[in-house]
Regions:
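ASCE RecA-like P-loop NTPase motor cores
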Residues: 1-339
Length: 339
């Protein structure tokens, strides 16, 4: 799908020339260009026209959440029929874990996640991995912060099709593998419920429910439902259900990671013991062993991001995956400089 720019205005003044020059520069492979203009001169509208002409997935970087939200609103109005997404930090509050050796005090990590922003982040990654070109993601420095492996995220996408033979219980297990949680009493975002042959999924990246109805071992209908009124909004012949969390892994990766972590734990504990640091060795062993038990039983643990390179299969010292890895090789970056 191509970008469809909708506006009551037409480029005027210096805008047509700027649009033409920027478009030509991108098409000719110019690595960097600068658009100058005073406040209120229509730079955002000019860039929107360039995006329409180039027709590639675009990352727009702003220096804080507030201005990113403003740009998101503006581009959303210019491209209402395209995928305009918002990706910033989803923490309302964050206190990292800490240890004070002098008093043997351990301070646990404490945080509060904004569920609405979490939904928008998942919508952004889902749009990028959908294969469509008409995607604009407005982001902040969060786009270079660590996140899950895009391959693992994509491998956990569930594709369903009306008339397809699929055992309902197999479908439910796949939802759990994609980190959706069954809750037949209170349906919240990222949950699903089962009533007979009907499965309602509150998609983690949407405001609506997806209803999948089975007839024996066959998918009979796929519908989008308003979660409050229960009104059917749309029907589909096929649908892709994206995971409920950005940090995905496979069972194979999980088992491999646990073995590697335990091997490294043995080496580090032995190293501490050789140095006479028996307390540190004991503390490290207890913490990591407990984390591995939690991962085996629940699939996650507090501070699991500390083990990310093992789950991603990365070598020591290599950077983690970030939002940039979810973009295709050929995409456009626009940086909005601060005043």
């Amino acid at each position: 799908m191509n970008f469809e720019l909708i506006s009551e205005y037409q480029p005027t003044g210096d805008q047509p020339e700027a649009i033409a020059q920027l478009t030509e520069g991108v098409l000719e492979g110019v690595p960097a260009q600068t658009l100058l203009g005073v406040t209120g001169s229509g730079k955002t509208f000019t860039i929107a026209n360039v995006i329409k002409n180039i027709n590639k997935p675009t990352l727009i970087l702003s220096h804080n959440k507030t201005l990113a939200a403003q740009l998101y609103g503006e581009f959303k109005s210019f491209f209402p029929n395209n995928a305009v997404e918002y990706y910033v930090s989803y923490y309302d509050y964050y206190q990292p874990e800490a240890y004070l050796p002098s008093s043997d005090t351990y301070i646990e990590k404490d945080l509060a996640i904004n569920e609405e922003i979490d939904k928008l982040r998942l919508a952004a990654t889902s749009a990028l991995l959908s294969g469509r070109k008409d995607v604009v993601v407005v982001s902040s420095v969060s786009c270079i912060y660590g996140m899950g492996n895009p391959s693992d995220f994509y491998n956990n996408v569930i594709e369903i099709k009306k008339g397809k033979l699929l055992d309902r219980n197999v479908f439910l297990r796949r939802l759990v593998d994609s980190l959706y949680v069954r809750n037949d009493i209170e349906l919240n975002r990222g949950n699903f419920r089962v009533k007979g042959d009907t499965v309602d999924i509150y998609l983690a990246y949407s405001d609506n429910l997806l209803r999948v109805m089975f007839w024996d071992d066959e998918i009979d209908a796929i519908e989008e439902i308003d979660p409050i009124s229960g009104i059917r909004l749309a029907t589909f012949d096929e649908y892709k259900i994206y995971p409920a969390n950005l940090f995905m892994t496979t069972k194979e990766s999980q088992l491999r990671a646990i073995h590697q972590i335990e091997d490294d734990l043995t080496k580090e504990v032995a190293k501490f013991e050789e140095e006479g640091k028996m307390y540190e060795a004991k503390r490290l062993y207890e913490r990591v062993t407990y984390d591995m038990e939690m991962i085996r039983e629940l699939g996650h643990c507090s501070g699991i991001e500390n083990y990310s390179r093992y789950f991603d299969g990365r070598n020591a010292g290599t950077r983690p995956y970030c939002l940039l890895d979810f973009f295709p090789d050929d995409f456009l970056i626009v940086i909005d400089e601060s005043h």
